[in-house]
């Protein structure tokens, strides 16, 4: 969700040229996702993240688009849910890797020990074990997130 719309759109030509291509659709509670984007300053080209209404529409566009592509290429697109990964990391990661025809390794659970460079907004987070505090984080600010709760029909 944190990229331009073209970045989250699988290309039909690519899917035809590389029929075994795997797309990972990583989903998270929409309010947590949108609020996380809103409070993160992104570089050029991410102006939609400065407005909660724009972020909400962008998120919905992503869901509609990926669901469309999933209808065309159901075996290529795997949806993984953030909250489920946090609750059952080994099981969910194994299912994802199985979909990608990749063997599970214990290092998948120890990703935070890697010393590889990371150039994303989550560069500090990937240096820590998975944590549950991001689940329903939006509720701490629910009084200021009426736009999001309305878009996604959530009660405070």
Where in the sequence are the language-model features?
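Structured core elements
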Residues: 22-25, 78-82
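A general structural signal for short secondary-structure junctions and capping/turn motifs
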Residues: 14-17, 70
């Amino acid at each position: 969700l944190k990229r331009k719309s073209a970045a989250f759109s699988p290309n039909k030509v690519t899917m035809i040229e590389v029929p075994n291509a795997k797309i990972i659709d990583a989903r998270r509670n929409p309010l947590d996702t949108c609020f996380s984007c809103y409070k993160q300053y992104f570089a050029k080209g991410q102006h939609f993240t400065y407005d909660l209404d724009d972020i909400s529409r962008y998120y919905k566009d992503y869901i509609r688009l990926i669901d469309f592509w999933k209808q065309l290429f159901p075996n290529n697109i795997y949806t993984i849910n953030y909250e489920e990964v946090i609750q059952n990391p080994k099981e969910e990661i194994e299912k994802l890797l199985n979909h990608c025809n990749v063997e599970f390794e214990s290092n998948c659970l120890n990703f935070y020990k890697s010393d590889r460079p990371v150039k994303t907004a989550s560069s500090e987070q990937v240096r820590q074990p998975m944590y549950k505090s991001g689940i329903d984080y939006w509720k701490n600010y629910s009084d200021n997130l009426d736009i999001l709760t309305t878009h996604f029909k959530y009660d405070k």
